[in-house]
């Protein structure tokens, strides 16, 4: 079997050469990551979460390292939907015409989400849209819409209409008692897939200043610390939903990728690993067939049948 066949993954709107997707917020709009490596090594990438208008983000410092990951409170800093659709995405299409683009829509009201999704849906090259309803470090909006199943279902219904057939993947927050009702709400609202999980709200304190390490006080925890939680939540949701799941949370190796797919994910995103190694995504993609051979895995999609 050819390597391309072993690694290929088909999801709604996305034909991926491999399951490795650069997570939103780790590669900007592609131009930043392209300075480090050839983006064609990826299955896909998710653009920076984009709002209706440009945002400067939260005060600095916004990022700090923890013992098992990172805390970030960027506050949805982005160029706004007009610049994203008129400048950023055309650059990606011109330089990487074969790379499937996943846009990421964020907002502070249902109306804003609908407008952003509508603009992305009318932009050539966008193959899928990730709905970021789980950002833990902005006030008013963001995660607030992703913690109430009824509100989430209503929002998803509206953005699915605005998407004009472009698949919608809802990025779920782990900052809830039970993530399953949120997954079910997204599915009932018409979502084509789920991305899980986003970061967990955390706090780090600077002993010298006796103040929080982040100006925003709290931030989103990512990295190896959240991997077991992500695996558990993906497994929980897979028991009740057949929607495609893109797993994310602490993945740092090809072995981690296989764990996520055995837990119920159909593809994965690499996030925090790219902070300490900008080449994490292409390295993991290159390692996958080697590790698959080690564990006797002929093709990745065989792991979709794993159940426990």
Swiss-Prot record:
Q: Which reaction does it catalyse?
A: (S)-dihydroorotate + fumarate = orotate + succinate
Keywords attached to this entry: Cytoplasm, Flavoprotein, FMN, Oxidoreductase, Pyrimidine biosynthesis
Task: Provide the residue positions that the database annotates as binding substrate.
Answer: 48, 72-76, 132, 198-199
Matching Gene3D superfamilies: Aldolase class I
UniProt GO BP: 'de novo' pyrimidine nucleobase biosynthetic process; 'de novo' UMP biosynthetic process
Q: Which pathway is it part of?
A: Pyrimidine metabolism; UMP biosynthesis via de novo pathway
What does the entry's cofactor note say about binding and number?
A: Binds 1 FMN per subunit.
Residues binding FMN, per UniProt = 24, 48-49, 132, 171, 197, 223, 249-250
Task: Report the active site residues.
Answer: 135
Give the location in the cell: Cytoplasm
What is the uppermost EC class here?
A: oxidoreductase
Q: Which InterPro entries match?
A: Aldolase_TIM, DHO_dehydrogenase, DHOD_1B, Dihydroorotate_DH_1, Dihydroorotate_DH_1_2, Dihydroorotate_DH_cat, Dihydroorotate_DH_CS, Dihydroorotate_DH_I
Q: List cystine links.
A: none
- GO molecular function: any one? dihydroorotate dehydrogenase (fumarate) activity
Q: Which domain of life does this protein belong to?
A: Bacteria
Cofactors required? FMN
What SUPFAM superfamilies does the entry give? FMN-linked oxidoreductases
* Pfam families per record: DHO_dh (PF01180)
Question: Which HAMAP family does the annotation name?
Answer: DHO_dh_type1 (MF_00224)
PANTHER family cross-referenced by the UniProt entry: DIHYDROOROTATE DEHYDROGENASE (FUMARATE) (PTHR48109:SF1), DIHYDROOROTATE DEHYDROGENASE (QUINONE), MITOCHONDRIAL-RELATED (PTHR48109)
Question: What family is this?
Answer: Belongs to the dihydroorotate dehydrogenase family. Type 1 subfamily.
Job of this protein: Catalyzes the conversion of dihydroorotate to orotate with fumarate as the electron acceptor.
Name under which the protein is recorded: Dihydroorotate dehydrogenase A (fumarate)
Gene encoding it?
pyrD
